[in-house]
Amino acid sequence: MKEFSSPADASNWLKEGKILIHPTEGVWGLGCNASNISACKKISNLKKRSDNKNFILLAPSISCALELSAELEVSQIEFLESVWPGHVTVIMQANNSLSQSLKAGDNTIAIRVSDHLPITNLLNSFNGLMVSTSANISNFPTSNSLDEVKKIFDDPDVAVYAHDNGGALKPSSIIDLKTMEYIRE
């Protein structure tokens, strides 16, 4: 399996429509170019996951994430600025410019602005959105072992962005911005 340490090399892999095992703040992620529908479907197939289950979007900056949202109240923007960058995914209403394939049926997106330097560097080099999901088979536990993840997703279209995960040992918290309720803590 190919491994990249350079954000530019990993970014080029994503631009080719390929899949990347990547570090996050917590568990290993599986990601691709958010605008490449066939790459998104490939991730669903690799994970044995339903096509109608949406992915988390990773944005390179708070301003990029805000550009994807429907109109927000000042208090909502202040909340986002207080949790991002960070290990928090937020569900919010999407604007109309975003592809319907990235939105849930209720026109929402799940989005995060990471504070983990390797993923931030990758997103800045890529200069776009990635979809991301935990690197495990659907409904099975996540693994913190890169070797195990590489065995599970051994495929010629999958490579590794070889940097360490952050210190969190679990997936990100998920908060619904409309209700301010935790979906996952």
Would you name each region that the model predicts?
Residues 1-185:
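Active-site-adjacent structural elements in enzyme catalytic cores
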